[in-house]
Amino acid sequence: MKGTIFAVALNHRSQLDVWQEAFQQSPYKAPPKTAVWFIKPRNTVIGCGEPIPFPQGEKVLSGATVALIVGKTATKVREEDAAEYIAGYALANDVSLPEESFYRPAIKAKCRDGFCPIGETVALSNVDNLTIYTEINGRPADHWNTFD
């Protein structure tokens, strides 16, 4: 992985549902109307199966996700040409400290060394109905579907 990972928070229904009540209160007063972006810089990336350097005394969250791997430089790409830039997909783990606000960039929560294990890039023809499972130390922890 050569560059920065750009990611979208709340990108499946279960994440949005957890925050629904908070989004009705100040300072939000409504759910986000556009994508909530965050980054994972290069220092966060480690290989699949490598140990995650957990900060001592901190609660850590883990969320499996699908990474779309852009294979060549892209600027102002037309929607109908976008597939030409996709090198493939990989499973990734969005490791982070708990977040308390979507108004502040999650730098301290998401950008720590080793906080983005990522698997091998594979070719997929359709990512619209994949079930993603998270296991922590061999035990089921979460699952969700890309359709959601």
Regions found by a protein language model. Give the residues of each.
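Glycine-enriched loop-and-adjacent helix/strand subsegments that border the catalytic/binding cleft
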Residues: 2-148
